[in-house]
């Protein structure tokens, strides 16, 4: 299939939200948004986080229960000696499972590398479209244009308050407020299992250096994630397989993404 892609332009902002210059974006931000590919790859990558589980092979079988036999006017289920309590059988209290979960079950779903790369390109393209960003429920000022590209010096921000101030100046801090207001206690047993709160998804900051101070500075801000451009995937760009996450790019991260993914596209 032949696609004629047209390059977009974007304004680069500094830490104070002022326009510094205008640059031409690579073709990866002009690719059509393929929700079907994004969903398929998201679900495949999600399976990599699943943990195999099984049961003790002897679970429900640690009993001396045997059937009393026939012609006694009672069911022939295994019964505990000197007690008469039914045991061992799947339909009894404390009995074995008929088909227990197995650690041999194949949990990880495979997906083609080319398809995975196209999904990332498509998800990146959605972050450059205001319609998709709004459809995800993100909140931002009307003056914000997408994609949001900022100068590389933002990676030197060292405290959470500095990062929050930066987000306020570029017009996306309202999205952090939305996340804070909507954090709630999870329904169900997950509360007992280390998953007490459900937190909405907020802004994503894509940087060019994993060791930069902003990585630690932003990790305690509700809903905000910081990811290296070399590692960014559909999991980050389209949480829940819904494309259009509010994303902030550093100038160098755009170049890294272009080098990493543009070979999949023919200009």
UniProtKB/Swiss-Prot annotation:
TM region(s), chain numbering: none
Query: A single Pfam family, by name?
Result: Ribosomal_L4
**PROSITE patterns xref list:** RIBOSOMAL_L1E (PS00939)
| Keywords, in A-Z order | Ribonucleoprotein, Ribosomal protein, RNA-binding, rRNA-binding
GO terms under cellular component: ribonucleoprotein complex; ribosome
Which residues are the signal sequence here?
Answer: none
Question: GO: which molecular function terms?
Answer: rRNA binding; structural constituent of ribosome
Q: Key word DNA damage present in the record?
A: no
* Gene3D superfamilies xref list: 3.40.1370.10
Q: Which InterPro entries does the record match to this protein?
A: Ribosomal_uL4, Ribosomal_uL4_dom_sf, Ribosomal_uL4_euk/arc_CS, Ribosomal_uL4_euk/arch, Ribosomall_uL4-arc
A biological process term (GO) from this entry? translation
State what this protein does: One of the primary rRNA binding proteins, this protein initially binds near the 5'-end of the 23S rRNA. It is important during the early stages of 50S assembly. It makes multiple contacts with different domains of the 23S rRNA in the assembled 50S subunit and ribosome. Forms part of the polypeptide exit tunnel.
On subunit structure and binding partners, the annotation says: Part of the 50S ribosomal subunit.
Which family does the UniProt entry place this protein in? Answer: Belongs to the universal ribosomal protein uL4 family.
What is the protein named?
Large ribosomal subunit protein uL4
Q: What is the lineage of its organism?
A: Archaea, Thermoproteota, Thermoprotei, Sulfolobales, Sulfolobaceae
Q: Which gene encodes it?
A: rpl4
């Amino acid at each position: 299939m032949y696609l004629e892609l047209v390059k977009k332009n974007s304004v680069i902002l500094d830490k104070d939200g002022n326009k510094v210059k205008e640059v031409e974006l690579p073709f990866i931000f002009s690719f059509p948004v393929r929700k079907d590919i994004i969903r398929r790859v998201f679900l495949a990558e999600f399976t990599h986080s699943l943990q195999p589980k099984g049961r003790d092979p002897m679970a429900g079988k640690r009993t001396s229960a045997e059937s009393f036999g026939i012609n006694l006017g009672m069911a022939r289920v295994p019964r505990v000696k000197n007690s008469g309590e039914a045991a061992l059988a799947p339909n009894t209290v404390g009995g074995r499972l008929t088909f227990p979960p197995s650690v041999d079950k194949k949990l990880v779903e495979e997906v083609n590398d080319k398809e995975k790369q196209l999904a990332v390109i498509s998800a990146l393209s959605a972050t450059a479209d205001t319609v998709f960003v709004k459809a995800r429920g993100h909140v931002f000022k009307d003056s914000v244009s997408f994609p949001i590209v900022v100068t590389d010096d933002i990676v030197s921000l060292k405290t959470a308050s500095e990062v929050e101030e930066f987000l306020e100046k570029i017009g996306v801090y309202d999205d952090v407020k939305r996340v804070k207001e909507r954090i709630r206690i999870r329904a169900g047993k997950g509360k007992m299992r280390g998953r007490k709160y459900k937190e909405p998804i907020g802004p994503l900051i894509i940087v060019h250096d994993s060791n930069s101070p902003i990585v630690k500075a932003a990790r305690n801000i509700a809903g905000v994630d910081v990811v290296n451009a070399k590692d960014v995937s559909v999991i980050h760009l389209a949480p829940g397989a819904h494309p259009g996450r509010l994303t902030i790019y550093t100038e160098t991260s755009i170049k890294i993404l272009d080098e990493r993914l543009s070979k999949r596209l023919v200009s």
